[in-house]
């Protein structure tokens, strides 16, 4: 499936403030982005997921005008990223895994340096974030651990009350306790921000995201609300009579199918109670029991990634 599939909810559609249309990025003979198309509505938390090399960081860099697209259109707040100005940048907070921070300054000194650039800077919010994330304001940034530097970047990205917060692999290399602290502090302070987050830590994303886009080999395989994705993907166990045979071929929406003894297991990517039972009993003889279990974002991703690689999506 080469084009993104947008699955919309029943709520009133928000304004799209981040968008890409037929976006391509070439590095020599390598196409990092291949006709990428998607949009992010204001007030949503959009998780950009995909395997290493899928193009997640490249997408973010094009949106931020850190890379020029080879062709196509990328825009933030309706302004093409090629023409993004300090006015638009002032409405964006940005945190990345390898973000450069001035190591010679203390946390407090760096915050004091940033404040004059943002008339909307909220000192009360800054203070509460320093407290919640337990950041040592008097320590030099170069002396902080990796986790503390990521926390510092987050405290620098939110107090000016941006409309859009971009997080590029913010949890990479952090131990579970620091990740939990970071996610907890972030969720308390994010408010009504629009968020674009790219991360391999899918369990953390699941607690933040309202929408998800699955990127593979530079293409958006699908884009939809998180609630819809977790509703339509179920792990299914079909118990058959001992003499029953598993039919072939199986429906294309049944991924990662395997049989263990008299139990057929698969992931149904178009699940509904009524259609699953009807389809299973039509295809399989001797059906004794059908069980469908919810899946985490991580388990969905580990099923969809190989399917995308093999051209099964």
Report the location of each language-model feature.
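C-terminal coupling/interaction segments
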Residues: 2-9, 268-313
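Short, flexible helix/strand-to-coil boundary loops that buttress conserved ligand/catalytic motifs
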Residues: 105, 230-233, 304-305
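ABC transporter nucleotide-binding domain
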Residues: 180-271
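Short loop/turn segments at beta->alpha junctions
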Residues: 106, 225, 293-296
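Non-catalytic alpha-helical coupling and interface elements of nucleotide-dependent molecular machines
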Residues: 116-119, 234, 306-309
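A structural detector for beta-sheet-dominated domains
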Residues: 21, 41, 239-241, 267-269, ...
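A generic structural signal for alpha->beta connector loops
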Residues: 120, 138, 192, 253-254, ...
